[in-house]
C-alpha cells in the first residue's frame, strides 16, 4: 500500500511540473521563433518578445 501511495505522489508531482511547463503561467521571453521551440512544446510563435505558449 505504501508503494502505491509513493507512486501516486510521484505522478502528482510530475504532472504538476508538466502542467507548469506546458501551461506556463510565467512569461517566456524570446528573440526569435526558434527560442520558443526550445522553451515551449508545440513550436509556438514569438510575439512582442514573448512566446505564445498555451
From Swiss-Prot:
Compartment annotation: Secreted
Post-translational note: Contains 3 disulfide bridges.
Signal peptide positions (record): 1-23
Recorded domain comment: Has the structural arrangement of an alpha-helix connected to antiparallel beta-sheets by disulfide bonds (CS-alpha/beta).
Highest taxon of source: Eukaryota
Family classification: Belongs to the short scorpion toxin superfamily. Potassium channel inhibitor family. Alpha-KTx 14 subfamily.
Name of protein: Potassium channel toxin alpha-KTx 14.3
Any one Gene Ontology molecular-function term assigned to this protein's record: toxin activity
Organism: Olivierus martensii (Manchurian scorpion)
Keywords annotated in UniProt: Disulfide bond, Ion channel impairing toxin, Neurotoxin, Potassium channel impairing toxin, Secreted, Signal, Toxin
Purpose of the protein: Potential blocker of potassium channels.
Cross-referenced SUPFAM superfamilies: Scorpion toxin-like
Expression by tissue: Expressed by the venom gland.
